[in-house]
Amino acid sequence: NVPVVLLNGSFQCPNVFCVLCDDERAMKEAMNQLLDSGCKRVLYLYHSSNNSGQRKLAGCRDALAAHNLPVDEMLMRRFDADKFSIHAVRDCLMELEREGLQFDAVLASEDVLAVGAMKYAQAVGRRVPENLSVVGYNNSNLCLCTEPELTSVDNRLPAICERIVETMLGVLEGREMPEKTVFTAEIIQRGSTRAAQDK
């Protein structure tokens, strides 16, 4: 009978309360924006295969399907979390380029991966966003530390955390609380992406 409150996870069970961001919809919108801006080969870079990670990956696939584009598994790359650093991401992308993988955008599941993509662009002389568009996820302070500043998906983490506390207190006080609360993300546009092209 101990209540459980999950952060950004979903689990249907009595006395379990879930507060999460709609990661699938958010990543679908981010991929859509890149495709609508003229990007043809978007590299999706991620490091986690947890519930949130699976929803993000599904969103990418949904966007490609909506644009009648096939899913190229070579462009869906899981980054080794054991080597998780900005410079390691840069080196990984440089290696992919040396192997012949072509991409004109990087959509990352976390801002730190996107910053690594920005470092890659700087290292190989690709101009952002003219030659490479980059989008991160979480809208962290890292977004303001790049040049140009990083476009990122704001997954409303502060609001989610507030709602978790409200839910937990409500449950402990005996009030009826919603079993599932889903927040809608927002894409914060900055200088690392181009505007949508006219159709």
Listing of model-derived features with the role each one plays in the protein:
Residues C39-R41, D104:
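Short acidic/polar active-site loop segments enriched in Thr and Asp
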Residues N1-N32, D36, E97-L101:
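Alpha-helical recognition/docking segments in bacterial nutrient-uptake
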